[in-house]
Amino acid sequence: MKITDVRIRKVDGQTRLRAVVSITIDDAFAVHELRIIEGKEGLFVAMPSRESNDGTFRDLAHPINAETRALIEKVVLDKYNSVE
């Protein structure tokens, strides 16, 4: 799997949200609404999610193994850090 495009939309404001991201995988599949969030230990990438009826949030799309999550996070954060 290769992430072939990353689009970053930085967010100005007083919240922990730093950017909203779209990625394209293998020039064939797009995932929108990933979020870069400032956590206690630095930035992390949150997957697209929706609030359920009981108030909890559930991922709409997510990696199924740690290697894929690490790849997505690295590529997205590298791009975020290179954008002014």
Sequence positions of predicted segments:
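Single-stranded nucleic acid-binding surfaces, predominantly the OB-fold ssDNA-binding core
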Residues: M1-E84
